[in-house]
C-alpha cells in the first residue's frame, strides 16, 4: 500500500524556497509547523513551535548539494524537507522519512 502524497500550501512553499535562496551562500535550518495537522508556518533558526502549533517537518537547505539526505541525517518517525540550490536557476524541495537504515522519499505536492 502506498502512502498518500504530502500536501504543502503554495504560499508556504514559496516562503521556504525564498528563505533558502536569500540565505545563500549559507544554509537554513528550522521547522515547518502545523495547525490541526496541516502545514501552516515556517520557523527558520528554531525547532520550537508556538503553543498551538506542532512540528510538521524538520527543514534544512543544501546550497551546494542535491536535496538527498543520508539516513543518518534523518530522525526516525519525523518528516524532513530538504531544499537544494545546487542547480543554477532551479530550486528543489524534496520530502524524506527514515525507513530503517535508509532514506525514503515521500511524494510532495504543492497546492493553492
What are these regions (language model features)?
Residues 1-56, 65-112:
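Conserved beta-strand-loop surface patch within small alpha/beta domains used
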Amino acid at each position: 500500500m502506498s502512502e498518500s502524497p504530502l500536501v504543502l500550501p503554495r504560499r508556504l512553499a514559496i516562503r521556504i524556497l525564498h528563505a533558502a535562496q536569500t540565505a545563500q551562500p549559507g544554509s537554513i535550518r528550522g521547522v515547518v509547523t502545523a495547525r490541526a495537522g496541516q502545514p501552516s508556518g515556517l520557523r527558520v533558526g528554531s525547532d520550537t513551535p508556538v503553543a498551538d502549533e506542532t512540528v510538521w517537518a524538520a527543514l534544512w537547505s543544501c546550497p551546494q548539494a542535491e536535496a538527498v539526505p543520508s539516513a543518518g541525517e534523518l530522525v526516525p518517525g519525523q518528516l524532513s524537507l530538504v531544499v537544494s540550490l545546487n542547480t543554477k536557476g532551479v530550486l528543489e524541495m524534496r520530502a524524506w522519512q527514515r525507513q530503517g537504515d535508509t532514506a525514503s522519499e515521500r511524494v510532495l505536492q504543492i497546492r493553492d
